[in-house]
Amino acid sequence: MTNIRKTHPLMKILNNAFIDLPTPSSISSWWNFGSLLGLCLIMQILTGLFLAMHYTPDTSTAFSSVAHICRDVNYGWFIRYLHANGASMFFICLYAHIGRGLYYGSYMFQETWNIGVLLLLTVMATAFVGYVLPWGQMSFWGATVITNLLSAIPYIGTTLVEWIWGGFSVDKATLTRFFAFHFILPFIITALAAVHLLFLHETGSNNPTGIPSNMDMIPFHPYYTIKDILGALLLILTLLALTLFTPDLLGDPDNYTPANPLNTPAHIKPEWYFLFAYAILRSIPNKLGGVLALLLSILILIFIPMLQTSKQRSMMFRPFSQLLFWTLIADLLTLTWIGAQPVEHPYIIVGQLASILYFLLILVLMPMVGLIENKLLKW
């Protein structure tokens, strides 16, 4: 008798995706982050669902409903902090996953890469609208500042902002629609993730060498299921440590003050995972220019496959490209630090230099070094 997992229409799909999937034998722990992102998504949807049962998307009760969740609901504080810190873990895994793709040339699978960029944008949108929901000071002012950036669009900007707000300022209508967006977007992310996997399984996984590994494949189960379980345990351990010992480490104290349109916080800043983009936005003194730089800082990922000049796919055997890659990582960490600092000397100039270096590395230096490496190898 043939195994049910190979004949049943539904089981067959799962079998081909997670059990009998031929996988390169040499993929390292950097390939764990895809499954960890799936785990993060499931955790966020589940904790979010339980939070939504007790939350009220209304300006007069939103803040107190979050306080009620933390004080009166059984393990409400735990669910709330799992959800908040789960978002941070999500972005850590996301950035590691993208970094892996950049380093090993996984972006050459263009459909998978483009769906991935779309996923990144959707997750960022979800995190942004979610941050508004507790209706603290930073929620309110973050929403005001970021949505107001759209007013930089010529001609239709102001109308567009008022349309998104549902009035002339961030108010009840804004909170209600942001809650609706925050509820629906994770399901759109789930659908996109399925398409992402579909395209990946058309080509098969890349590997650290960047060389086709069709002659050296092993089944996904048990080899990589056990490896993914180890990664999942480490992720859960880190998340639990963060949630139970320092739940507010990555949050902003201003968000424990109820939203007040009459009182602006001294330093308006987003959550840590948006700080690099926020630093790029602030480094340009022109509003429209800043918005364009902010957009380009993320959308530049779409152009990465077109900027590939090296004859080698992976950076594994390219020491000069490796140097530039780690310079880019250091630059992004610098931008993240600058985004959290006030707008004053010397942070302004450091932010501007780091922003220039970011675009220079991706658009000019890395493609140039790829060509130089080809010459050195006489290719």
Swiss-Prot record:
Bilayer-crossing regions: 33-53, 77-98, 113-133, 178-198, 226-246, 288-308, 320-340, 347-367
Binding locations of a ubiquinone: 201
Any GO MF annotation of the entry: ubiquinol-cytochrome-c reductase activity
Organism: Sotalia fluviatilis (Gray dolphin)
Cofactor(s) demanded: heme b
Additional observations: Heme 1 (or BL or b562) is low-potential and absorbs at about 562 nm, and heme 2 (or BH or b566) is high-potential and absorbs at about 566 nm.
Membrane topology annotation: Multi-pass membrane protein
UniProt binding sites for heme b b566: 97, 196
Record: residues binding heme b b562: 83, 182
One cellular component term from this protein's GO annotations in UniProt: respiratory chain complex III
Major subcellular location class: mitochondrion
SUBUNIT field: The cytochrome bc1 complex contains 11 subunits: 3 respiratory subunits (MT-CYB, CYC1 and UQCRFS1), 2 core proteins (UQCRC1 and UQCRC2) and 6 low-molecular weight proteins (UQCRH/QCR6, UQCRB/QCR7, UQCRQ/QCR8, UQCR10/QCR9, UQCR11/QCR10 and a cleavage product of UQCRFS1). This cytochrome bc1 complex then forms a dimer.
Entries under InterPro entries matching the protein: Cyt_b/b6_C, Cyt_b/b6_C_sf, Cyt_b/b6_N, Cytb/b6-like_sf, Cytochrome_b, Cytochrome_b_C_euk/bac, Cytochrome_b_N_euk/bac, Di-haem_cyt_TM
The name this protein goes by in its record: Cytochrome b
Signal peptide range in chain numbering: none
GO biological process per UniProt: mitochondrial electron transport, ubiquinol to cytochrome c
Keyword Transmembrane helix: yes
Similarity section: Belongs to the cytochrome b family.
Compartments, record wording: Mitochondrion inner membrane
Keywords, ordered alphabetically: Electron transport, Heme, Iron, Membrane, Metal-binding, Mitochondrion, Mitochondrion inner membrane, Respiratory chain, Transmembrane, Transmembrane helix, Transport, Ubiquinone
Domain of life: Eukaryota
Primary role: Component of the ubiquinol-cytochrome c reductase complex (complex III or cytochrome b-c1 complex) that is part of the mitochondrial respiratory chain. The b-c1 complex mediates electron transfer from ubiquinol to cytochrome c. Contributes to the generation of a proton gradient across the mitochondrial membrane that is then used for ATP synthesis.
Record carries keyword Metal-binding: yes
